[in-house]
């Protein structure tokens, strides 16, 4: 069977998230997409990965490493899988009512909603 649809995986990052929680799962999806393509099992990339945050741009992780969010999470449309990173910054996100409200709305719009570690807000 040859895949026709590119599955969009969106990771929500936030300040002081764990960098492995953000990039680790995205690496798995990205590597899987390359493998499926190399085996001729897809006509287009099987997975497209994207990092989003409160605002587009650099987000400092708990290690001090920065990841770059392509867009603000509120601008996400058409995600198939939505993941929320974990890390020591999750406690501040528990007070981010606009993010929590957006995640609740997304739960009925995405195929999968998941979290990594403490990202289960």
Where does each model-flagged region fall?
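Glycine-rich nucleophile elbow surrounding the catalytic serine of serine-hydrolase chemistry
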Residues: 121
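Extended, subdomain-level signal for the structured scaffold at the beginning of enzyme domains
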Residues: 1-113
